[in-house]
Amino acid sequence: MTELVHTRAELAAARDGLTGTVGVVMTMGALHSGHETLLRAARERADHVLVTIFVNPLQFGPDEDFNRYPRTLDVDLEICRRAGVAVVFAPVVTELYPEGKPRVWVAPGQLGEELEGQSRPGFFHGVLTVVLKLLHVTRPDLAFFGEKDYQQLTLVRRMVGDLDVPVEIVGVPTVREPDGLALSSRNRYLSPDERAAALSLSGALRAGAAAAAVGADAGAVLAAAHAAFESGPSGARLDYLVLTDSDLEPGPTAGPARMLVAAWVGTTRLIDNMSVQLAPYS
């Protein structure tokens, strides 16, 4: 049976009752099939799964969708129950931030100011701060994050390593609709026409990956992705489309690489990414 707790004291008591390994899945709610994949991965690796549901105000800018972000706790709880989750921690904002905002934040470093960090200033300060707080209060052995938010996953791994947080970070592959659209809680904002336009993101990534698969160099891979985005369904406005190495460093030439894209579709901002394998120069 899934136990729902709302305070840190209730969480501590519930956590103390879990023997064996504990895996945490941190969410903002509005759970979908992608989250269910995270829950299954956690069940496979850990004796118990703990889920956090918290719409973190620190990671929303003044013009972003904090108030509009979907909140579906009853539905989320049913998904967690079906998945065999042991504990769900769903605090109110003042439970984690009694003074409204923390006095100390986690600085993400240079990578946190690029890509999503450049388009959304302060975003990763808020993300890493809440992740670190939740790691402290949930005390997991493993923490599961989707590769869909690849920059976030990379920064969380760096934070855990640099700050000696005793937890294993596990990345879980992106879940997609049959037509390629990456699952996201924000997809529910899209109209039918916008839903079609959103395929420009995955279409660009697939074109780049296809070019890499036949031996194209980094420049040609990126050019193929840009061409596919521009020729794809109309209605998506590109923010960035880049090719990095697997650690998000610029200038990959061979081996594992990562292509990342962000675009506006109507009033909704979507992100996606895909791994590509660059052939060595002959």
Curated annotation (Swiss-Prot):
GO terms for cellular component: cytosol. The gene is panC. The active site is at 35 (proton donor). (R)-pantoate binds at residues 59, 152. It comes from Salinispora arenicola (strain CNS-205). GO terms for molecular function: ATP binding; pantoate-beta-alanine ligase activity. Belongs to the pantothenate synthetase family. ATP binds at residues 28-35, 146-149, 175, 183-186. This is Pantothenate synthetase. It comes from the Bacteria. The keyword Nucleotide-binding applies.
